[in-house]
């Protein structure tokens, strides 16, 4: 009788903080009405592929369907940290992607209950091994770290240019406190003031993070640690349907792998980046969370083999 409970307690804890939201997406391939979205949603769905005890801290309105919360719970995500605001409306984002899918226009952003979000970390997760701070106001991200009962083994921060524009001092404060930052190439250049990504990463290291992950969308991701650099390719896909959530899925795969393996070394972070890229490659195949909802471990492992083949080569180097 006690075995499952006992096993559950032995799993490493992953605390995920981010948005749980409604999205409406338009791409050259079609458009959706309001569907399930939000960074913490994608991160949570990605964490399901690892042997971790994951919990989401977020906020939704009374208009948020119970079936969406059930979906997360059925995928093994603890949802006690998702606050439901009576009479409130859930955060809503609508965007339209251009033909190349690399750029998009935000059509609507309604913060709704997110405007007053004050995250409360459930007692059982105040000692989480890994904390993933999804893209939110830096003050909210700092507020989460302040609630931890002990320093997590790894803190991963995701942020974006919006916060660099309107909350830079607060952002720099939280960056000081994290081990890993994940941003895209444009954001790395903006944050550092350096065009070369190698120089940008070196500058960001001096702000606090030991590891800098620079996401380059369909061109993969770079991992920097002091003088070490690793490049993870993105799998060339025949069909890219909707890039929404790919970056969050990547972060969820990255953090989930680290939380499961407990090994925080450069060589293991390389594996984590491959796991993140692998999961993100599935996410883009359908609208919203649709593909991540049906994805199984067999498919994930089969594609991991493709990732390995993508970059394996044998060259005999003469001394």
Model segments located where?
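Conserved phosphate/ATP/ADP-binding segment of small-molecule kinases
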Residues: 149-154, 162-231
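Conserved phosphate-binding/catalytic region of the ribokinase-like
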Residues: 197-319
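Alpha-helix C-terminal capping segments
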Residues: 44-53, 257-262
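Extreme N-terminal starter segment of soluble prokaryotic enzymes
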Residues: 11-15
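Conserved N-terminal subdomain of the carbohydrate kinase-like
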Residues: 22-34, 52-132, 146-152, 301-319
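Glycosyltransferases and closely related glycan-assembly transferases
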Residues: 1, 142-155
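Short catalytic helix/loop segments, enriched in acidic residues and glycine
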Residues: 30-45
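Short, Lys/Arg-enriched N-terminal segments with co-localized hydrophobic residues
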Residues: 1-10
């Amino acid at each position: 009788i006690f075995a499952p409970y006992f096993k559950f307690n032995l799993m490493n804890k992953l605390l995920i903080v981010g948005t749980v939201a409604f999205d409406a997406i338009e791409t050259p391939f079609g458009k959706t009405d309001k569907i399930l979205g939000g960074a913490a949603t994608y991160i949570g769905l990605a964490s399901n592929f690892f042997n971790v005890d994951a919990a989401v801290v977020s906020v939704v309105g009374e208009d948020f369907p119970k079936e969406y919360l059930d979906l997360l719970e059925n995928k093994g995500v603890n949802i006690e940290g998702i606050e439901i605001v009576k009479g409130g409306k859930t955060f809503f984002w609508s965007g339209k992607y251009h033909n190349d899918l690399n750029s998009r226009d935000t059509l609507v952003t309604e913060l709704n209950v997110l405007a007053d979000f004050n995250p409360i970390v459930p007692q059982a997760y105040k000692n989480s091994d890994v904390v993933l701070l999804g893209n939110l106001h830096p003050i909210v991200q700092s507020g989460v770290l302040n609630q931890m009962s002990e320093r997590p083994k790894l803190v991963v921060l995701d942020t974006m240019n919006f916060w660099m524009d309107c909350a830079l001092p607060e952002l720099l404060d939280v960056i000081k406190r994290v081990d890993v930052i994940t941003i895209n190439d444009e954001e790395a250049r903006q944050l550092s003031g350096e065009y070369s990504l190698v120089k940008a990463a070196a500058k960001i290291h001096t702000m606090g993070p030991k590891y800098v992950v620079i996401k380059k969308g369909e061109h993969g991701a770079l991992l920097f640690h002091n003088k070490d650099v690793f490049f993870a390719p993105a799998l060339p896909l025949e069909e890219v349907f909707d890039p929404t959530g790919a970056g969050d899925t990547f972060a969820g795969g990255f953090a989930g792998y680290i939380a499961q393996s407990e090994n925080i070394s450069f060589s293991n972070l390389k594996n984590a980046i491959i796991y993140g890229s692998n999961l993100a490659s599935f996410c883009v195949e359908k609208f919203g969370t649709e593909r991540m909802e049906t994805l199984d471990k067999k498919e994930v492992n089969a594609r991991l083999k493709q990732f390995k083949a993508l970059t394996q080569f044998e060259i005999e180097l003469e001394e």
